[in-house]
């Protein structure tokens, strides 16, 4: 199966986790896009969706799915999103698409987090995929120095990219993240960091993993 076929497979499987007559959170990226296309087929069953990026909001609207502002919603029944890496405890690296901050905010309001990805995203230890950090532009160089001092790795500015919040992304290459919860917390304590792409303090509850033999359901 192609990677796109695996993504579509998990997108279809994720529909089972959509709770009727509730608001749901929708992530950003290629796998999330497959989910949005599937969600469109049952759009009458939900009250609406909260998007984690402008791109996701546009795709939802194109399908006629009601898009809500997060500030007008008290609770989301589920948040469904992809990942760039997932370890055995369902700690994740996300943010390859640059929407990590809004993804974390939307997730914070959700009762359940269902991660959807193909099996190429499964890893024993996080860090082979560069870890994104959203940074206030004037703090870019300072944050890069602090990251190297504390964790090693090689920070690279994501050229020509600005987040939906008007900030920049540093991608940290060459990490081996053995304690993702501690690292997530410490990174977020560096002045100038908005947030980082570790989803460990709040990890996935369920990982729907697309394989050549079908969808594997992994629970945290």
From Swiss-Prot:
The keyword Mitochondrion does not apply. It comes from the Bacteria. Pfam families: Rib_5-P_isom_A (PF06026). InterPro entries: NagB/RpiA_transferase-like, Ribose5P_isomerase_typA_subgr, Ribose5P_isomerase_type_A. Pathway: Carbohydrate degradation; pentose phosphate pathway; D-ribose 5-phosphate from D-ribulose 5-phosphate (non-oxidative stage): step 1/1. GO terms for molecular function: ribose-5-phosphate isomerase activity. GO terms for biological process: D-ribose metabolic process; pentose-phosphate shunt, non-oxidative branch. The keyword Transcription regulation does not apply. It is an enzyme of class 5 (isomerase). Substrate binds at residues 28-31, 81-84, 94-97, 121. Keywords: Isomerase. Its EC number is 5.3.1.6. It catalyses: aldehydo-D-ribose 5-phosphate = D-ribulose 5-phosphate. One of its GO terms (cellular component) is cytosol. The active site is at residue 103. Catalyzes the reversible conversion of ribose-5-phosphate to ribulose 5-phosphate. Belongs to the ribose 5-phosphate isomerase family. NCBIfam families: PRK00702.1, rpiA. Homodimer. This is Ribose-5-phosphate isomerase A. It comes from Hydrogenovibrio crunogenus (strain DSM 25203 / XCL-2) (Thiomicrospira crunogena). The lineage of its organism: Bacteria, Pseudomonadati, Pseudomonadota, Gammaproteobacteria, Thiotrichales. The gene is rpiA.
């Amino acid at each position: 199966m192609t990677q796109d076929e695996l993504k579509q497979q998990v997108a279809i499987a994720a529909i089972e986790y959509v709770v009727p007559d509730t608001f749901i959170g929708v992530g950003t990226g290629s796998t999330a896009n497959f989910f949005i296309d599937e969600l469109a087929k049952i759009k009458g069953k939900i009250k609406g969706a909260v998007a984690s990026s402008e791109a996701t909001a546009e795709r939802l609207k194109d399908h006629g799915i009601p898009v809500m502002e997060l500030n007008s919603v008290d609770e989301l029944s589920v948040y469904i999103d992809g990942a760039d890496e997932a370890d055995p405890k369902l700690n994740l690296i996300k943010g390859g698409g640059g929407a990590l901050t809004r993804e974390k905010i939307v997730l914070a309001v959700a009762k359940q987090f269902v991660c959807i990805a193909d099996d190429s995203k499964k890893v024993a230890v996080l860090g082979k995929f560069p870890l994104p950090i959203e940074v206030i532009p004037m703090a870019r160089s300072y944050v890069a120095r602090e990251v190297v001092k504390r964790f090693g790795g090689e920070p690279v500015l994501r050229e020509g990219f600005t987040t939906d919040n008007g900030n920049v992304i540093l991608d940290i290459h060459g990490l081996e993240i053995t304690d993702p919860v501690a690292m997530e917390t410490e990174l977020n304590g560096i002045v100038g960091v908005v947030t980082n792409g570790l989803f460990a303090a709040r990890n996935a509850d369920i990982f729907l993993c697309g394989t050549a033999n079908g969808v594997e359901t992994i629970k945290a």
